[in-house]
Amino acid sequence: HQEKKPITLYNYASSLLHLNADHYWLTEFSGEWAHEANMTERQLDFGKKIIDTKLGVRANMFCSPFFFLSLNQPARENEGDILMGTIGWTGNFRFTFEVDNLNGLRIISGINPHASEYSLKPKTVFSTPEFIFTYSTAGTGEATRNFHNWARKYQIKDGLADRMTLLNNWEATYFDFNEDKLIDLFGEAQKLGVDMFLLDDGWFANKYPRSGDHQGLGDWEETKDKLPNGI
């Protein structure tokens, strides 16, 4: 800005979209550890619907910064008009969906203004996080594939190139493993052409072996009963 003194920003959205349709159906995602991304779909009517969080760096723990908006019918996989959006921001966020008296819908996306005052010095630039969205006329399937293609092209390193594959033992064994079980995993993974193996939680501590999630953290030595020959 070009003022002589700093100015304070209190509310700074990334985007405003205005849509016109007969009906609007919103899908949001919520959850917790081991129960993530549960879908809830609801029809929007007159007034405001807000999806937001004030958990800071844990912002996506219970409330996902992502939504579908289906026009004129509930969201379907292979048909219908779908707007799918997210925000490139890992902190507090807010999406506001407001249906007005003429049945128009405004979608405002950005950083949550709660406790987000920002002092901007003279002759400096402030940029809001990107609101990333796609529009599909062929349902949620096309919209999600649009996001996949965007991520491969612009966000993931070497997203369009061949990448190495990795096997993690966690879902196969949890804490219950030994050398023989791991070697069996190696063999099956090798048949599939997997490049790397990652040994997950449960390999450390002897006095209080890491056989569950209530003991062993910090004792960084191989559990002899599980790995007698070490890692």
Listing of model-derived features with the role each one plays in the protein:
Residues 118-137:
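Short Pro-Gly-centered flexible turn/kink motifs
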Residues 87-93, 99, 132-151:
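Acidic/glycine-rich phosphate/pyrophosphate-binding loops and surrounding catalytic core
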Residues 109, 122, 228-231:
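Short, intrinsically disordered, charge-balanced linker/junction segments flanking boundaries
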Residues 115-120, 192:
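Glycine-rich, acidic/polar active-site loops that bind/position phosphate-bearing ligands
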Residues 31, 139-140, 156, 226-230:
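Glycine-centered helix-coil hinge/cap
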Residues 158-231:
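Aromatic-lined carbohydrate-binding/catalytic grooves of carbohydrate-active enzymes
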Residues 1-99, 103-105, 114-116:
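Polysaccharide-binding surfaces and accessory modules of carbohydrate-active proteins
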Residues 120-121, 148-163:
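N-terminal amphipathic alpha-helix/helix-capping segment at the start of soluble metabolic enzymes
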